[in-house]
From Swiss-Prot:
GTP 1 binds at residues 9-16, 56-60, 119-122. The lineage of its organism: Bacteria, Pseudomonadati, Thermodesulfobacteriota, Desulfuromonadia, Geobacterales. GTP 2 binds at residues 182-189, 229-233, 294-297. InterPro entries: G_ENGA (IPR031166), GTP-bd (IPR006073), GTPase_Der (IPR016484), KH_dom-like (IPR032859), KH_dom-like_a/b (IPR015946), P-loop_NTPase (IPR027417), Small_GTP-bd (IPR005225). Belongs to the TRAFAC class TrmE-Era-EngA-EngB-Septin-like GTPase superfamily. EngA (Der) GTPase family. The keyword Cytoplasm does not apply. HAMAP family: GTPase_Der (MF_00195). GO terms for biological process: ribosome biogenesis. The keyword Transmembrane helix does not apply. GTPase that plays an essential role in the late steps of ribosome biogenesis. This is GTPase Der. It comes from Citrifermentans bemidjiense (strain ATCC BAA-1014 / DSM 16622 / JCM 12645 / Bem) (Geobacter bemidjiensis). The gene is der. GO terms for molecular function: GTP binding; ribosome binding.
Amino acid sequence: MKPIIAIVGRPNVGKSTLFNRLVGRRKAMVDDMPGVTRDRNYAEVNRFDVPFILVDTGGFEPETSDRLLQQMREQSRFAMDEADLILFIMDARGGLTPADRDVVDMLRRINKPVFYIINKVDGEKQEAEAGDFYSLGVDHIHTISAEHNRGVGDLMDEVLAAIPYDREKELDEEITRIAVVGRPNVGKSTLVNRLLGYERVVANPTAGTTRDAVDTRFTVNKKPYLLIDTAGIRRKGKTVQKVEKYSVMDALRSIERADVVLIVLNAEEGVTEQDSKIAGYAYEAGRGCIFVVNKWDTLAKDNSSIAKFTEEIRRNFKYLPFAPILFVSAETGQRTGKIIAEVDQVMEQYCKRVTTGELNRVFTQAVDENHAPLSAGRRVKFYFATQVAVKPPSFVVFTNCPEGIHFSYERYIMNRFREAFGFNGTPLKLIFRGRDKKDA
């Protein structure tokens, strides 16, 4: 297991700026609005051939009456429990605060390496003004400017020397990547917390509480997974704040990174146009898909309720007839235990390979039973089919008329492949290609 380094500190001291500086890309949102980084945000970093997991936390306020800040504080404490090494960030411009002193007192009681860092020290003037921080009585204080990369290299040299790492124990493991997507406040964060068994993501009734896409590694029956809890995707007209625009892009990037996408729907509201757009993103990206109908426990139901909602999904998502549907309650845990098992089944189909012999037996039978329509008066001939890729399963069909295959016939061939080989939960890619003369 890679060592874990947690970045903690009060809101708006520059934790996310340092996080992004070390990660080398804009993974955590950076904005002047206090509390922008609300959850623990994970990233894998490899610096000078030393790999580690970096954790960016929400702001740490030791004493606060604000509910969201209280939740962020608990997340920071959880991150410190997980971490092998802690970077505690303070703000040179804001000066030393009583809250800083309280956190330092708490960190002294933790039996882990702690680096005390004063951020926003852009030059000698700020260096001189940072003298108050030395009254904390800690062994060593590092002064940096994360924004301007001042002192960061020297800091990390010392950090890398201090973190525990055993290269022999580091495994190159295959991991199933799961993205959780949906409109704001359909219950994604509650679902993530239910799957993981603890409060990993701040779940709050306010729509849009989860702003960053937050990655979490976990294992089930010794099998590794990476869970990506995306920020809710809003309709374009409602994406007013700059920070919310970041979240939409982050959610789309999360879909691109995933193998399997959990499309979370709100049972109370039914299927909306925005749900269709979100599912369309996953389909167009060629990802395995599972519909998760959340808040199912809140509905008054009869014996036909599941059938009716299933029909509504199939009617609105005609391009995803292969996606399994699960009806769950993240709040109570009802049926959530089935999700990972379903992910495993979809992942198996997403990676499935079919031999050329088996494929052409099914393909030839399908063509014999239903010939392709003429193309501009020309008879369409097929030669053979072969699988060329997985994730998703992709096939090339060689023909004399690659431009003349109607989409309905393409759908017919894919349906026959599904009947024969399954491919439940995964899209298929079918490419028609002309045969080279040398192959004729």
